[in-house]
Amino acid sequence: MNPLATLEQGLADIDAQGLRRCRRVADTACGAHMTVDGRAIIGFASNDYLGLAAHPRLVEAFAEGARRYGSGSGGSHLLGGHSRAHATLEDQLAAFSGGFSDAPRALYFSTGYMANLAALTALAGRGATIFSDALNHASLIDGARLSRANVQIYPHGDADALDARLRACDAPTKLIVSDTVFSMDGDVAPLARLVALAETHGAWLVVDDAHGFGVLGPQGRGALAAHGLRSPNLVYVGTLGKAAGVAGAFVVAHETVIEWLVQRARSYIFTTAAPPSVACAVSASLAVIASDEGDARRAHLGALIKRTRAILRATHWQPVDSHTAVQPLVIGSNEATLAAMAALDAQGLWVPAIRPPTVPAGTSRLRISLSAAHSFDDLARLEAALVTPIGAAA
């Protein structure tokens, strides 16, 4: 078959299963109220949990960073691209999120995907065993695959099953890998148990706090701080394009671990550093996150989460047991989920349909993503509209 025809057939198969993904075009800044594809909508799609993506303080820091450093870094971090802005940000991130370690150090990455690949491929390799939660993010799954380690998938959130697998493993290097807040269900991993298991079995514990950083814990310091957890075995990955409202990611761990990543993590070494202006904006974001304003935004987000759960129960949906900003509505089939999304979209509400392979087959869902930028009036609009997709999805 012609190579192009093979792809065309593959796309036709995707269409037949109701799995084609489509991009929508935003004409305005990320926020609760946006213009998307030329229409005014209320967005429940972004991960801008604190509503900082268009914050004037961050925008000005970004602009000032560009005026000072220019538009690009010019090279990789190890070949001329590591600016004072990057170095300052890493020090700030280590101080902000490294309370679990006696000697924390941070390493900044352009994306969360690259950060997870770096941590897993540098710490594991042939002869190692990675124990990965069944619902981990794709970047953790790919990092485990690329590491060439043996990979064992343990049932979602099941610390007892993980313990049994660790006891049966005699690999010299073991890594437990888990999201903290799971991005499609909104539930939280049993972090205290995972830390205890890592220490008992002499394993690294790599946690991806993409959806907890900035939101959970005192001053938004993340899921580990929320639980008061400390361990030299911890490797913490945080994302800066969600609650922080900018872009990039970071790894915080003991300084020896970070130096190892600098020397061995290919997704850090062999790529151009992010523009310094991005680091400047993230530094400004950290200041807001840790401030009284950050506390107020987290409190408002918490109230929105509570109200949303009440709305879902009142409108006869069966909400997943999530007390985070991710509120999924599991529908089941791809077609019914797409119909539900379209019904909401017709009423000016953007609530994306999440389908396989992002979630397991038969669990397609609407994913309501809440932000401190939302108002209770926005939730009232959502409440009034939720009756329509029930009929469409039935």
Curated annotation (Swiss-Prot):
Pathway assignment reads: Cofactor biosynthesis; biotin biosynthesis
Which of this chain's residues are annotated to bind substrate? Answer: 21, 137, 358
How would you classify this enzyme at the top EC level? transferase
Q: Which GO terms describe its molecular function?
A: 8-amino-7-oxononanoate synthase activity; pyridoxal phosphate binding
Q: Does the keyword ATP-binding apply?
A: no
Q: Which residues bind pyridoxal 5'-phosphate?
A: 112-113, 183, 211, 239
**Per the entry, which co-factors are needed?**
pyridoxal 5'-phosphate
Reaction(s) this enzyme catalyzes, per UniProt: 6-carboxyhexanoyl-[ACP] + L-alanine + H(+) = (8S)-8-amino-7-oxononanoate + holo-[ACP] + CO2
Q: Which InterPro entries match?
A: Aminotransferase_I/II_large, AON_synthase_class-II, AONS_Archaea/Proteobacteria, AONS_Proteobacteria, PyrdxlP-dep_Trfase, PyrdxlP-dep_Trfase_major, PyrdxlP-dep_Trfase_small
For this protein, the record's Pfam families field holds:
Aminotran_1_2 (PF00155)
Q: What is its EC number?
A: 2.3.1.47
Alphabetically ordered keywords of this record? Biotin biosynthesis, Pyridoxal phosphate, Transferase
Asked if Transferase is a keyword of the record, the answer is yes
Q: Which SUPFAM superfamilies match?
A: PLP-dependent transferases
Q: How does it assemble?
A: Homodimer.
Xref: HAMAP family: BioF_aminotrans_2 (MF_01693)
State the family named in the UniProt similarity comment for this chain: Belongs to the class-II pyridoxal-phosphate-dependent aminotransferase family. BioF subfamily.
Main function: Catalyzes the decarboxylative condensation of pimeloyl-[acyl-carrier protein] and L-alanine to produce 8-amino-7-oxononanoate (AON), [acyl-carrier protein], and carbon dioxide.
Q: What is this protein called?
A: 8-amino-7-oxononanoate synthase
